[in-house]
Curated annotation (Swiss-Prot):
Belongs to the ATPase alpha/beta chains family. GO terms for molecular function: ATP binding; proton-transporting ATP synthase activity, rotational mechanism; proton-transporting ATPase activity, rotational mechanism. CDD domains: ATP-synt_V_A-type_alpha_C, ATP-synt_V_A-type_alpha_N, V_A-ATPase_A. The lineage of its organism: Bacteria, Bacillati, Bacillota, Clostridia, Eubacteriales. ATP binds at G231, P232, F233, G234, S235, G236, K237, T238. Produces ATP from ADP in the presence of a proton gradient across the membrane. The V-type alpha chain is a catalytic subunit. Its EC number is 7.1.2.2. This is V-type ATP synthase alpha chain. It comes from Clostridium botulinum (strain Hall / ATCC 3502 / NCTC 13319 / Type A).
Length: 590
């Protein structure tokens, strides 16, 4: 391949000449240290190259060699439990080769070429296969069965296939189509900027259970859905993302740390091996892929890290798994776009972001979905994408937030005021929304309880009434309210503090199953119904608010999943206490 020459260097942007044989999005090696870059613009024989490593030390005249291939990821056994940088270089392998700091031009394979995996065929010689068909399985971790699929573009009859221990580049099967014989390895490559093909998209109808009460009850996201978590600094975006990565009922989690602080990735690395998956009892790390592209790594690689992560997510989706992808934070990705756009001297849009910010964000989020995979056997997989957005100063009218809100169906708006009041997760129930509620309400009513939707609507209306009553209280004081309105305020407070508030660092409260959420919500609303009955019978509000059973309602969140029937005892106690108050006839008649 012909070698070009560096003409100009501007931070992560390098312009090279003599590149007439190259194509846009080709990967190139720049300079004597062979820095990895990607062509993002071609003008005659000049190529504008986005370099994914530090460009200090490059000089005009340095060689630029094109590989003739687009930026691709290696897909195969070895992805789970691994930690990659933004362009899928394994950080453990880099540390072994170059020490604690990533040196320029270091080259390592994304997947280990020496490790052997036990391949068990599920097809036999003579079977006809096509792209997407599963030919064998590898038990990658104790909970992830890695399915080896026929790569896109290959079909035919299996000539040879054998069981045994192989590396990812060994031939495990041969497929013959007419006169052409294709060798199948356990590894395949896929360009990151192109979505992997699928048979057809399905309407998402099943919720992704997260164990976070405010999300599952009020603003659920479906498997295959899209959601965003915008919020100012310190409002808890990363903790929400960590909670979702820990407890979401997805089979695989892909966590992309895009331009955020390194200690947040350290938290994940420290916590996930210790925490147990509630369904399998195995460490959470055994179902997780980490992509660490922290704030002290080159800016340009942030742009690639988002695509690297979603391509890995699509690969596992094609196996028929449910995937949850967390991107923290898409604002840093947008800032990388803005920096490259500025250096390319493109016409700026709002706040300096490129005019194509909205279309790039849409390209990313539309790769989510609930799909039927390609292949002769139907497999249904789901890829759920949850992106954090970090608007400066919490201003939700800024371009990245607005571009994201036009695309995603769920908005979990984090509120600085709630965070300052130590209400976590600080998701504002008055601003947030989910457009999936109507689709998943039938599933909830069928699988959790027939009155789930009714309880949810009742609780939300109480919280909304509280907001309007608080305005009256601020103007004329609480004494202007009737006892029934004051009861509403108390029940709404109970909903906020005893139900919506959740401690991510408490061993019991960090996760609540749907069954427990239903009983807790019903308990708070049962108190409201019983208290209304008592008020109508002449009982005074103060007596109701002083009941000891209210402490038990507040502590219901700390009842473990094994002892969930203890909540039923609180229902019975509450009924008895209210009946006693009514029979006594109120404080004046006592």
């Amino acid at each position: 391949m012909k070698t070009g020459r560096v003409l100009k260097i501007s931070g992560p942007l390098v312009v090279a000449e003599g590149m007439e044989e190259a194509n846009i999005y080709d990967v190139v090696k720049v300079g004597e240290k062979r820095l990895i870059g990607e062509i993002i613009e071609m003008r005659e024989d000049r190529a504008s190259i986005q370099v994914y490593e530090e460009t200090a030390g490059l000089a005009p005249g340095d060689p630029v060699i094109t590989t003739g291939e687009p930026l691709s990821v290696e897909l195969g056994p070895g992805l789970i439990e691994a930690m990659f940088d933004g362009i899928q270089r394994p950080l453990n392998a880099i540390k072994a080769k170059a020490g604690d700091f990533i040196t320029k031009g270091v080259e390592v394979h994304s997947l280990d070429r020496d490790k052997k995996w036990h391949f068990t065929p599920v097809k036999k010689v003579g079977d006809t296969v096509e792209a997407g068909d599963v030919i064998g399985i590898v038990q990658e971790t104790s909970i992830v069965e890695h399915k080896i699929m026929v790569p896109y573009g290959i079909k035919g009859t299996i000539e040879t296939i054998e069981e045994g221990d192989f590396t990812v580049v060994d031939t495990v099967a041969k497929v013959k189509d007419k006169d052409k014989v294709s060798d199948l390895m356990m590894m395949q490559k896929w360009p990151v900027r192109r979505g992997r093909p699928y048979g057809r998209k399905l309407n998402p109808a099943q919720p992704m259970i997260t164990g976070q009460r405010v999300i599952d009850t009020f603003f659920p996201v479906t498997k295959g859905g899209t959601a965003c978590v915008p919020g100012p600094f310190g409002s808890g975006k990363t903790v929400v993302q960590h909670q979702l990565a820990k407890w979401a009922d997805a089979q695989i989690v892909v966590y992309i740390g895009c331009g955020e602080r390194g200690n947040e990735m350290t938290d994940v690395l420290n916590e996930f091996p210790e925490l147990k998956d509630p369904k399998t009892g195995e460490p959470l790390m055994k179902r997780t892929v980490l992509i660490a592209n922290t704030s002290n790594m080159p800016v340009a690689a942030r742009e690639a890290s988002i695509y690297t992560g979603i391509t890995i997510g699509e690969y596992f989706r094609d196996m028929g798994y449910s995937i949850a992808l967390m991107a923290d934070s898409t604002s840093r990705w947008a800032e990388a776009l803005r920096e490259m756009s500025g250096r390319l001297e493109e016409m700026p849009g709002d706040e300096g972001y490129p005019a194509y910010l909205g279309s790039r964000a849409a390209e990313f989020y539309e790769r989510a979905g609930n799909v039927v995979s390609i292949g002769s056997e139907e497999r249904e997989g789901a890829l759920t994408v949850i992106g954090a957005v970090s608007p400066p100063g919490g201003d939700l009218s800024e371009p990245v937030t607005q571009a994201t809100l036009r695309i995603v169906k769920v908005f979990w708006g984090l509120d600085a005021q709630l965070a300052y009041r130590r209400h976590f997760p600080a998701i504002n129930w008055l601003n947030s929304y989910s457009l999936y509620i109507e689709k998943i309400s039938p599933w909830m009513d069928e699988n959790v309880a027939s009155d789930w939707t009714a309880l949810r609507i009742k609780a939300m209306s109480l919280l909304q009434e509280e907001a309007s009553l608080e305005e009256i209280v601020r103007l004329v004081g609480i004494d202007a309210l009737s006892e029934k309105d004051r009861l509403k305020l108390e029940v709404a407070k109970s909903l906020r503090e005893d139900y919506l508030q959740q401690n991510a660092f408490h061993e019991v409260d960090t996760y609540a199953s749907l069954g427990k959420q239903y009983k807790m919500l019903k308990l708070v609303l049962f108190f409201y119904d019983e208290a209304q009955r008592a008020l109508n019978a002449g009982v005074y509000l103060k007596e109701l608010l002083d009941l000891e059973v209210r402490d038990k309602i507040a502590r219901a969140k700390y009842i473990s999943e094994e002892n969930i029937e203890n909540i039923d005892a609180i229902f019975n106690e509450l009924s008895e206490v209210i009946d006693q108050l009514i029979s006594k006839g109120g404080i004046m008649n006592a």
